[in-house]
Amino acid sequence: MSARKGKTERRTRETSVEILLNIDGTGKFDVECGIPFLKHMLETLSRYSEIDITLRAEGDNDHHIIEDVAITLGKALNSARGSAPIERMSTRTVAMDDAVVMTSIDIIDRPYAEIDCPDP
């Protein structure tokens, strides 16, 4: 099987984001985004998922950078997987250092879900 790699760029008036990733990597990362906590989270994602991530992001404020990194990361993951099947959803709970981490991921390609639930 060939390596599953994705490269995506996003440029707006507020941000510039470039991501290169390899789903079949070893967890190597090179992240420059100017936001220490976002960098930490992306490096942690890379390390534990073993997805190689190279990322460059800059922008006018943290909110726009985080938002556009998320959009670009999702597009790069979608591009990298190609037609190869991968799990769409996953939930994990992990004790890590002095915290319990709970996460759920759904990599469907839709911006939101709207559900009309009547009051009981």
Positions of PLM-derived features:
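Structural preference for solvent-exposed beta-strand-turn elements
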Residues: 2-120
